[in-house]
Amino acid sequence: MLGGKKTGGMNVYVRDLSRALEAVGVAVDVFTRSQDDCAPRVVHDLGPLARVMHIPAGPERPMAVGDTEPYLGEFVANVLDFAEREGVRYDILHSHYWLSGLAAEALAAGWGGTPIVHMFHTLGAMKNQIARDASERAPQSRLEGERRVARIADRLVAPTPAEEVQLVELYGADARKIVVVPPGVDLAHFNPIHQLQAKQMIGIPPNRKNILFAGRIEPLKGIDTLLEAIALLKERQVTDLSDTCVTIIGGNPWAETLDEELERLQRMRLDLGLDDLVAFAGARDQQILPYYYAAAEMVVMPSHYESFGMVALEAMAMGTPVIASEVGGLAYVVRDGYNGFLVPRRNAEALALRIADLLGDHRLRQQLSANAMNYARDYSWARIAQQILGVYQAVAAPSPVLS
């Protein structure tokens, strides 16, 4: 599911990288905390050489990421037991997110110094720079954990040169250990579909223009800026919105108890008089997501911070232009005026103008669409996996078995 409470780009990254590595003969074991005691402990759905292991650690139910830290020791012990029972030896530990980096450190010690490759995906120090209040700030334990992982990892994978600089300046990371490798996109899955076919598939009238947001419902995604921009367009009548809808993919708008941010955004929609324009569609399965991208005239990513922004690549692969905040990885993925537009973050005025530009100019949308598809081809997972494999080979023996 995209836009679910505990899902996002990192899960997609791990899944697709594992499949791409498996496709070139690398054996991959993915260890994750079990969230369901009825689920199989070992799942073989990433390919013949790839497995997903659900490891008990704490209550076997979904938990907020921050609440899993006390169970890190139990997780490590159970992974060590599993590997010993299976008689498996790993040549590389590739950890994702800071807690997994700490787990990798303990596992490496248990296995006699297995090299660690780490990718943070998001940085607590960067989130804190744009946090509006204490509730949005990363805790001190995370910042200290990230500094430790930056120090002990043999290689750090940064998705952009911007994060490479942030790792050095904010965490004191050794620049010689950092390699820049962007995420990829599944070009077979995100393969262009005719827009009319896509609209029919998801129930959007053929003559209706669609503005799409896809992602988790959380403050740093800047969805409130999108709502403010649409309200400006409606108020000023800069462009005709009578044939336009805004679809927000993410969260669960039908839950008995709404997520705090989702509740705030729904109130905001009503206060701004946008209930006839904006629809909260909830999280959507990855299988149907390409149709939403293809049905949209544009994808809007008004984020306050993005380490990379895989949604932008997925949209471009479908031929959909992206309007994004000029922050983090989005500033590298979106080429202003080529495959989309960049706007200052938290600037509803600038965002409204760019939305109006795309809504009102079919020829411009076509040009950006063609450019976006060409651009996305450079990010195939086959190509990215080769770059990651090069990182592994630099720190370990040939023919690695990965965890």
Describe each PLM feature range:
Residues 259-284:
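Nucleotide-activated donor-binding/catalytic signature segment of Leloir-type glycosyltransferases, i.e.
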Residues 312, 321-324, 334:
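Short hydrophobic beta-strand element within catalytic cores of glycosyltransferases
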Residues 283, 291-296:
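Short alpha-helical donor nucleotide-sugar binding micro-motif in glycosyltransferases
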Residues 304:
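Aromatic "clamp/platform" in nucleotide-sugar-dependent glycosyltransferases that forms part
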Residues 7, 12, 20-90:
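A conserved catalytic-core segment of Leloir-type glycosyltransferases
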Residues 350, 357, 364-378, 394:
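A short, well-ordered alpha-helix in the C-terminal region of glycosyltransferases
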Residues 336-337, 341-348, 357-362:
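Conserved acidic donor-binding segment of nucleotide-sugar-dependent glycosyltransferases
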Residues 191-204:
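A short helix/loop element that forms part of the nucleotide-sugar donor recognition site in Leloir-type
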